[in-house]
Amino acid sequence: MEKVKVQDAVGMVLCHDITEIVPGVFKGAAFRKGHIIEEKDIEKLLDIGKENIFVWDLLDGYVHENDAAYRMVKAAVGEGIALTEPKEGKINFLAKFPGVLKINLEALYEINADEQICFATIHGNKTVTEGKLLGGTRVIPLVVKEEVLASFEETCRKNGPIIQVVPLKKAKIGIVTTGSEILNKRITDKFGPVLRAKAEELGAVVVGQSFSGDDKNVIRDQILKFIEEGVDLVEVSGGMSVDPDDMTPAAIRDCGGEVVTYGAPVLPGSMFMLSYVKGIPVVGLPGCVMAAKRTVYDLVVPRLLTGEKLTRRDFVLLAHGGQCQNCERCVYPDCGFGQ
């Protein structure tokens, strides 16, 4: 840092905010810390009484914080991310459209191992709305060495985007509703309306709902019928416990395909099941999905609707943060559930 006359400061980096006060009209920063002094700034600085200022000289091999931020977002940001203009060297990330936020955690940790880098995000694998603040980046010093940025860019080249929003598909969903009491109209189906509302929330559409009773073969055949009709997801509601009449898990297994999990370390929603039949996800939904505001459904189904292929490992990772706190006022996804 050095003190120089404003006439000699062109091309140098301002070390501090410079305040301008116009009584009754304006009080604020005329120039922000990190601003690179231009020829046109000299008269303005003199007008507000600044004949000398503290600056950094931008030496060869160093990059100004604003330019560094632009380079970092170019290297690290994937689809679905809108950027703010740099302010004091920081650029924020906003969601361009509704979708599921994906963060490459290992790469995120690797780039932040350098103490001159700040790249912060909210938790990933959650639904976000258009305009949602997702994170931001900056370098810590006003100027940073070129090799620091080169290392950052190389990490991004090796790992792909650090942050991106994957859009939700305009998915077609088929619902198979189990339970003899519903088939025989002893009670009104309350699961279907809940699932339709959740589908609408995710931009999907329920193209059909069938009622199977508790016959394993009927449940199986109705699942396969929806798949043959070209749905993107089959949701089987109810029949997921160990009661003798609960046949959903056996029916899903009888469809063939790959069972990913029967059981999830999530409360509510531990009796959840996921299988892929002819490449189409089939989920078995426990009764809590109908009764509770947020459940395992909200942690898993949005990811399925982006086309992500889930594994048992994905479910294991839900354990940390898998307990919903049943808050009186639900603010999901802006809470710790699923994080």
Q: What are these model-predicted stretches?
A:
Residues 7-11, 29, 83-86, 126-128, ...:
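Solvent-exposed alpha-helices and their adjacent loops that cap or buttress functional pockets
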Residues 51-54, 81-83, 90-92, 132-133, ...:
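Structural motif
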Residues 143-169:
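Short N-terminal or domain-adjacent regulatory/targeting segments
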Residues 180, 207-338:
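Short glycine/threonine-rich loop/turn motifs
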